């Protein structure tokens, strides 16, 4: 499978870079590497839609200057690309997310992730905050659903924190395969990885649902998530901006949830809702 690597130069970089990631994510882009000049984004070559990209907000506003170049990369070349920039991430001095080539450190939870083209290493604000939520809440003996699992890192930490029954679901085949690899790499034995979307959810009820996707998918699927949540369960949502929190909360309240708290990092939000 061939991918396009698009190198975006953005001025000023923030918050435009974060906005561009969100917009490109809705166009099928799978992975992003941020840098001082902007970001590098990856999309399957046969899914790239130039017209749709040029119609997104950041290309139509004059608030930012954006230029880009592209080149074709084959799937196996991704390892060399992310290894150049992937540094270990320490969350709350308890959880280290690292690559196989990083040295192990003395932390409570050591997670080894080889992300390849998948989203979810802890570098992005949304993943970092969702990992923080897991560390701040009791997962012992809980059943957990990780929607849009990416690398599987959230489900992996949830199991390490005591969750006993877990499902990790992603619609992208690459993420599905990568999650299987990372689950095995971290010696997790209670995570079932599935390929698909919210339509896979049946009558199974969960104590905790984690969904780090994007605003539009969350708004569409919140009703389904609530139907799969046990009494006194918790729903953690991320992948949206602070200005979207009111809209997300209104949808959760519509289906019987109550807002409890949210974390915020660089205008990104990760919120907790409970029955």
Model-based region annotation:
Residues 117, 121-202:
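Conserved SAM/SAH cofactor-binding pocket of Class I
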Residues 109-115:
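A short, charged helix-loop
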Residues 31, 165, 235-236:
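A short hydrophobic/small-residue beta-strand
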